[in-house]
């Protein structure tokens, strides 16, 4: 037989396998084919690829993108503001068609408390203030423990579409993102799209609820052979239990909200999120095609009518009235017809909603307690929170902001019913960097940390009745500035209230009175006094304001009087501008002489008014400045100036501080100015105009002024108050009198709910307005601390300095 024939014979011969060999081959096939179940934590995470621009391929034809958005003050807003937000939210939902799946994710996760606490720690400097630094840090730590700032609360919206390719998906996802960002902007919320690294960090935070830091870089993928899932997956998943699961060293459970209530509340979602524990709440929303929704409702009505006919036939056969129908049948029929009317005649659509709640905890018992608490919230609103039996893995993966729901438990709701789950509660003010402590949010218990320098206009006002805590609020802010920044602080102190604090901080108190040997020259000027080339223009405004106060009268200065004063100003500063030496600085006597030298009645009239302040008993300001201000914190005590000189003293102090602002600007240093009884500077027309001009200039020159007053009516009656309010992005409202509350509510657009926080409020409690945010706050300072002792003005409580 030839070799070729042998090969053909052997090829045709069947290969017989033993039973053992067949079993072995089948086992190998099963091993490599797999059982369809994930065998690693990474394999359990249900997405295929994450692209650097933030697009995620969830399935071969499904792509998603994620938006993060900020909270806004919804619960305490005006009724019309709430309505506008709700209507905009309805418009957002109606924008979605059946091809877009939307997932709202609300993630409250704990962060490392030790790392978090470090941001409030004020380091010792080895000076006389370390004990105050330590005590102040302890107060902040206590507020951190008592509040909810151990949680980071974030809000996301993930939207998913189907597409044949990444290129097609990318184009449509971008268009949708642009539209959605517009809806959030119309509601007053900031929103932005997330890139891939940011999306991975969010999923990592869900899988690592203990706050483990996230580390990832695209450069690491190729050399390591890892996928993006390797950087977010926990050490393990354990899904053996029907009603809970293991997540690394943690325990978790997912429940769904069974909506039973006939009416839903816009506070339900807020209550779920108002917890001290880590929680993740997800709303999966799928729009139904409008024509399909109407057909479905019509079919349901037809079915109900058929059931009604059957019941009527049964009634006739049984011999009782055919109009007597089962109550449920009558109710369902009426509801279905109402729903059909809503879909056909109103701007409403149908949606399928899946509401999921994910709880995680360190122990099983803690987990059960957290789930029980969440169930209590649902019960409060006549709903039920039901644990997902044997679907914990699907529930967990549906809680990832991937835009895919693996839970088929859905509830049909109309647009307005879905929009009732308003994704906003109250805006927090918690800035990083050089932010300072301003109390705690009375609504949420979270700390308020602000950096006024970041505001568009950091100027501020503090308003409140006597005993409401105005001076305490100012002193708390002054202490924060002193301990946390290198800035200078100046205080105009009409009641000598700041002496203990200033002395304890080794500051300087400049006492101005008719008998004092401390002198401040109101005509002081430096070459940086104005941003214009000619510093005399602004100084002339000051001198006009000064003369207006000196002359009194209801109508202010006449035009000719202003002219002669301005002419005199040009004359008296000529020697100093030619040779800027201290001895060439003019004083009031020089102004008096320059007026008399004009030999016209108007100039003589102004000069006569100045006599009292030049050669009379009130000549305290007719001297060259003899105080050397080199301290970081300076208080001008004008208590003993008396009623006649108080307003003049305040104006002069304001001008002196403006000079310091101009000097500090060249050093790159901010200057804080606290002016008590600020309303006195806004009574006379010229003085109010000058004060308003200075108020505007402060911002440009690195000054941060704060006006303080208890006479809100006087303040708001000034013709310049609109300019003051427009140039003040920080307003602290403490307890207000009844009439003042109404005026402030109208001027500052404060809702009745917010107004309650300044109605008979305790000292140190009220409303904080920062740019467009209005927050209720309270700022308790423990009485058993040194800080309280040097701040309080209550008789018998203050420190002896």
What residue spans do the PLM features occupy?
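Extended, folded cores of ATP/NTP-driven motor/assembly subunits in large transport
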Residues: 2-424
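A short helix-turn-beta junction within AAA+ P-loop NTPase domains corresponding to the substrate/partner-engaging
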Residues: 506-510, 720-733
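P-loop NTPase motor domains
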Residues: 72, 79-98, 109, 271-273, ...
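Conserved P-loop NTPase
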Residues: 748-800
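Post-Walker A helix-loop "phosphate-sensing" segment adjacent to the P-loop in P-loop NTPases
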Residues: 480-490
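Hydrophobic positions on the alpha1 helix immediately C-terminal to the Walker A/P-loop
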Residues: 473
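Conserved lysine of the Walker
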Residues: 470
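Hydrophobic anchor at the beta1->P-loop junction of P-loop NTPases
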Residues: 462
């Amino acid at each position: 037989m030839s070799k070729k024939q042998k090969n053909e014979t052997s090829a045709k011969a069947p290969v017989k396998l033993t039973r053992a060999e067949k079993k072995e081959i089948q086992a190998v096939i099963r091993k490599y084919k797999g059982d369809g179940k994930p065998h690693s934590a990474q394999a359990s995470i249900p997405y295929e690829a994450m692209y650097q621009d933030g697009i995620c391929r969830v399935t071969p034809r499904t792509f998603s993108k994620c938006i993060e958005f900020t909270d806004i003050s919804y619960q305490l807003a005006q009724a019309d503001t709430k309505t506008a937000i709700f209507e905009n939210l309805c418009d957002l939902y109606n924008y979605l068609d059946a091809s877009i799946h939307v997932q709202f994710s609300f993630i409250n996760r704990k962060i490392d408390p030790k790392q978090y606490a470090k941001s409030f720690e004020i380091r010792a400097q080895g000076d006389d203030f370390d004990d105050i630094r330590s005590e102040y840090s302890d107060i902040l730590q206590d507020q951190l423990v008592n509040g909810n700032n151990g949680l980071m609360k974030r809000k996301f919206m993930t939207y998913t579409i189907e597409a044949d390719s990444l290129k097609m998906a990318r184009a449509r996802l971008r268009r949708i993102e642009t539209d959605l960002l517009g809806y959030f902007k119309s509601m007053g919320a900031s929103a932005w799209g997330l890139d891939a690294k940011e999306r991975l960090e969010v999923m990592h935070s869900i899988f690592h609820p203990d706050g483990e830091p996230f580390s990832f870089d695209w450069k690491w993928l190729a050399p390591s052979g890892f996928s993006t899932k390797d950087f977010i997956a926990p050490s393990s998943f354990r899904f053996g239990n029907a009603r809970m699961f293991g997540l690394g060293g943690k325990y978790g459970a997912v429940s769904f909200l069974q909506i039973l209530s006939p009416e839903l509340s816009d506070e339900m979602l807020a209550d779920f999120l108002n917890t001290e524990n880590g929680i993740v709440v997800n709303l999966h929303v799928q729009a139904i095609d409008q024509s399909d929704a109407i057909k479905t409702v019509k079919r349901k009505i037809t079915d109900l009518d058929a059931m009604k006919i059957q019941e009527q036939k049964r009634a006739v056969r049984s011999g009782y009235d055919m109009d007597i129908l089962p109550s449920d049948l009558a109710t369902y029929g009426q509801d279905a017809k109402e729903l059909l009317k809503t879909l056909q005649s109103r701007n409403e659509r149908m949606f399928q909603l899946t509401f999921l709640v994910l709880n995680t905890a360190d122990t099983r018992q803690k987990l059960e307690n957290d789930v029980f608490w969440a169930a209590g919230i649902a019960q409060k609103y006549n709903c039920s929170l039901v644990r997902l039996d044997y679907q914990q893995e699907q529930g967990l993966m549906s809680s990832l902001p991937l835009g895919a729901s693996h839970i088929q438990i859905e509830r049909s709701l109309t647009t307005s019913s879905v929009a009732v789950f308003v994704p906003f509660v109250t805006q927090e003010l918690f800035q990083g960097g050089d932010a300072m402590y301003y109390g705690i949010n009375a609504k949420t218990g979270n700390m308020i940390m602000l950096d006024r320098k970041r505001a568009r206009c950091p100027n501020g006002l503090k308003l409140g009745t006597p005993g409401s805590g105005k001076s305490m609020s100012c002193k708390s802010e002054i202490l924060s500035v002193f301990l946390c920044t290198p800035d200078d602080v100046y205080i105009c102190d009409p009641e000598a209230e700041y002496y203990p604090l200033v002395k304890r901080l080794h500051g300087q108190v400049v006492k101005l009175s008719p008998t004092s040997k401390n002198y401040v020259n109101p005509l002081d000027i430096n070459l940086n006094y104005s941003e214009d080339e000619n510093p005399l223009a602004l100084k002339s405004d000051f001198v006009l304001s000064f003369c207006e106060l000196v002359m009194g009268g209801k109508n202010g200065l006449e035009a000719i009087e202003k002219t002669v004063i301005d002419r005199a100003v040009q004359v008296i500063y000529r020697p100093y501008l030619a040779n800027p030496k201290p001895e060439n600085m003019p004083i009031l006597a020089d102004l008096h002489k320059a007026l008399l030298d004009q030999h016209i009645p108007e100039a003589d009239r102004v000069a006569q008014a100045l006599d009292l302040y030049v050669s009379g008993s009130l000549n305290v300001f007719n001297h060259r400045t003899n105080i050397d201000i080199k301290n970081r914190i300076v208080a001008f005590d004008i208590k003993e100036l008396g009623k006649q000189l108080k307003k003049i003293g305040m104006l002069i102090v304001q001008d002196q501080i403006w000079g310091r602002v101009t000097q500090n600007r060249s050093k790159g240093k901010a200057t804080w100015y606290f002016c008590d009884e600020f309303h006195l500077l806004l009574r006379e027309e010229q003085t109010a105009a000058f004060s308003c001009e200075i108020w505007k200039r402060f911002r440009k020159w690195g000054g941060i002024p704060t006006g303080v007053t208890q006479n809100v009516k006087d303040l708001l009656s000034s013709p310049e108050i609109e300019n003051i309010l427009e140039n003040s992005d920080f307003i602290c409202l403490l307890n207000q009198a009844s009439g003042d509350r109404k005026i402030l509510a109208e001027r500052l657009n404060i809702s009745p709910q917010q107004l309650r926080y300044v109605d008979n409020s305790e000292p140190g409690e009220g409303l904080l307005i920062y740019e467009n945010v209005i927050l209720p706050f309270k700022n308790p300072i423990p009485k058993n601390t040194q800080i309280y002792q040097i701040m309080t003005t209550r008789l018998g409580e203050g420190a002896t300095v």
